[in-house]
A protein has these predicted regions:
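Dynamic helix-loop-helix/coil hinge segments at AAA+ ATPase domain boundaries and subdomain interfaces
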Residues: 1-24, 212-214
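Walker B catalytic acidic pair
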Residues: 42, 105-106, 117
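Canonical AAA+ ATPase core
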Residues: 84-89, 110, 114, 122-213, ...
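P-loop (Walker A) phosphate-binding loop of NTP-binding proteins
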Residues: 43, 77, 145
């Protein structure tokens, strides 16, 4: 299979367990190909865990899930050293993050210290325990979920932490027809029976192919102009950082690959910008008072920044 056929096969296989959420699956796979992590804002019970299991099966990845609660410790994520009487030395006991695909369920129920431990692993790709450094397996993907802020026992993730996630999306309720189909059979069981379409090494090759997608200089300038517009907007108190621009570039390349192209276009930028950038924007007090949202302000900016004409 060529690259486009492989990507389509992954989506088709994953879609057997996740009904009616093709757009969500495409966004998640795009972020995975871009080498990023995923943050999902939604209520419990809309299929987030099923999505995670489905992707780990189709991508051939090891998988661990942790239900975050206030009593979860950083060492539960990173691991710890244990004294081994037989050898007379300390040995490392791996934490939950030592895997390919880590589902951090309800991350905003954990303490800030525990959240920071996970975000450090996400950023560095390695973790430190008692002065020793351990590298997480590659590929390494974190899918974190959080309940809407204000739900019992939750605390909002600060901007410095949400900025570490390449995309922030919602799943939403299923349609009436799809919910009926869900009632007819267990989607979770269907996810467990999915076949592996590719191997972890294949995924690394797909990531390399995404990174090699050609981007014209004028398109890089377009991305920077979008970021600059967020920094200059009176509706925004904190605009897109260079990290956000880099995420936009990676997502643009990955989206082009998803579409079967070896080159990126302005349409790729516009397709991924809403869910790659909106969580990196902090609105001004006046904008919030006026009822504006990060999504609506970003949409206005995307419409105002001139698109380049590629040669």
């Amino acid at each position: 299979m060529n690259t486009k056929e492989t990507i389509d096969a992954i989506l088709a296989e994953t879609g057997k367990a996740v009904l009616g959420k093709d757009d969500v699956l495409r966004r998640i796979l795009t972020a995975i190909l871009a080498g990023g992590h995923i943050l999902i804002d939604d209520i419990p019970g809309v299929g987030k865990t099923t999505m995670a299991v489905a992707f780990t099966r189709t991508l051939g990845l090891d998988y661990k899930r942790m239900q975050f609660t206030p009593d979860i410790l950083p060492s539960d994520i990173t691991g710890f050293s244990m004294y081994d009487k037989a050898s007379g030395s300390f040995r490392y006991v791996a934490g939950s993050a030592m895997t390919n695909f880590f589902l951090a369920d309800e991350i905003n129920r954990a303490s800030p210290k525990t959240q920071s431990a996970l975000l450090e692993v996400m950023q560095e790709g390695r973790l430190s325990v008692d002065g020793k450094t351990y590298t997480v397996p590659q590929p390494f993907i974190v899918m974190a979920t959080q309940n809407p802020f204000g739900s019992s026992g939750t605390q909002e993730l600060p901007e410095s932490q949400t900025d570490r996630f390449m995309i922030r999306i919602t799943v939403g309720y299923p349609s009436r027809e799809n919910e009926i189909e869900i009632l007819k059979g267990s989607r979770r069981s269907a996810a467990l029976s999915l076949r592996a379409v590719i191997t972890p090494d294949d995924l690394l090759q797909l990531r390399k192919a995404a990174a090699d997608v050609h981007v014209e200089d004028s398109l890089f300038a377009y991305m920077v102009d979008i970021a600059a517009a967020t920094r200059e907007s009176h509706d925004i108190s904190l605009g897109i950082s260079p990290r956000g621009t880099m995420a936009l570039s990676a997502m643009t390349r990955a989206h082009a690959l998803m579409e079967g192209r070896a080159y990126a276009t302005p349409d790729d930028v516009l397709a991924v910008a809403p869910y790659t950038l909106s969580h990196r924007i902090t609105l001004s007090g006046d904008a919030r008072f006026a009822g504006k949202t990060a999504a609506s302000v970003l949409d206005a900016i995307l419409k105002s920044v001139p698109m380049p004409e590629l040669v």
